[in-house]
């Protein structure tokens, strides 16, 4: 079975470390890289194979994960994107669906919900 390459886009160090540890629990996945700014994700997708992105909605320097996800889906529609947030606002979920995000994960959810 091929190893799935996962890019993590999260500006908070503790959350980024947690997401990395969740991915490392999955035997057929590996962390392909981490970024603190969503606007750098599109460029990173062009540099090498990525299967899945765990994308925080609000990242460093007010970089918008939803806007980045929308651009990535235009150029790399095969890449799956899971939007990640701690903000329980319906407008984020609505926009994530509209731009084609594949899933939505709340940071307060158990890690099994992410990896399971």
Could you tell me what each predicted segment is?
Residues 54-69:
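Conserved phosphotransfer microenvironments
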Residues 13-33:
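Two-component/phosphorelay signaling modules centered on CheY-like receiver
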Residues 43, 66-78, 98:
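Short amphipathic alpha-helix used as the core "switch/output" element in two-component signaling
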């Amino acid at each position: 079975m091929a190893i799935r390459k996962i890019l993590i886009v999260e500006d908070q160090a503790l959350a980024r470390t947690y997401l990395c540890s969740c991915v490392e629990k999955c035997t057929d996945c590996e962390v392909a890289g981490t970024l603190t700014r969503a606007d750098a994700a599109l460029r990173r997708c062009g540099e090498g194979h990525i299967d899945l992105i765990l994308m925080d909605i609000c990242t460093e320097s007010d970089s918008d994960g939803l806007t980045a996800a929308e651009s990535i889906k235009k150029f790399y529609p095969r890449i799956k994107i899971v939007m990640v947030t701690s903000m329980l606002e319906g407008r984020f979920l609505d926009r994530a669906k509209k731009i084609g995000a594949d899933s939505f994960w709340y940071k307060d959810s158990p890690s099994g919900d992410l990896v399971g």
